[in-house]
Design a protein with these regions (language model features):
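Nucleotidyltransferase catalytic core that binds NTPs
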Residues: 1-168
Length: 168
């Protein structure tokens, strides 16, 4: 597995096979790892991002105490034969970023977490623009997030296909 920390270094990503973007905030569990396994079964180049996104944390949610388990995450991704791990620097990734408004964010989970899905879609959009993956993987348990990502891909004419993995 190759670890990438700078945006400019994303150019080393193997483009001979389609790219599967698997965005995460780290603290990986079986569900995340099953998405990597699914991408490998489809013979895709797996690119996992680990970025604890400050934009999706509300005032009563503690960004500072979100679990950061990078060494364990790296080990688990190695075991799954992940191809690339992107660990972007917060300042570099968010520099000049345009904050987006997420549709469908005023009900279900979003009703109690104002701004959460705006932060999610802002950073996912940044990854899509930087990586231009053929596929983007999300877990089935995040239903509202799936709706928002699917809508964003469609409205912004991304050719990226959303793949929803089974809840593990």
């Amino acid at each position: 597995m190759k670890i990438i920390k700078k945006i400019d270094d994303l150019k080393i990503v193997d483009k001979e096979r389609p790219i599967a973007l698997i965005p995460t905030m780290g603290n990986l569990h079986a569900g995340h790892l099953s998405l990597v396994e699914q991408s490998k079964n489809l013979k895709l180049t797996s690119l996992v991002t680990i970025f604890v996104n400050p934009l999706q944390f509300g005032p009563n949610e503690d960004f500072e105490t979100y679990p950061r388990t990078i060494f364990q995450d790296e080990e688990n991704l190695e075991k799954e034969n992940c191809d690339f791990l992107f660990l972007p620097d917060k300042t570099e990734l968010l520099d000049g970023i345009k904050n987006l408004k997420a549709p469908f964010s005023n009900f279900l989970c979003g009703k109690n977490r104002p701004g959460h899905f705006d932060g999610v879609i802002t950073v996912v959009n940044r990854f899509l623009e930087l990586i231009n993956p053929e596929f983007c993987f999300f877990g089935q348990k995040d239903f509202q997030q799936q709706l928002i990502i699917h809508d964003h891909l469609k409205k912004n004419n991304f050719s990226t296909k959303l793949i929803v993995g089974q809840t593990v």
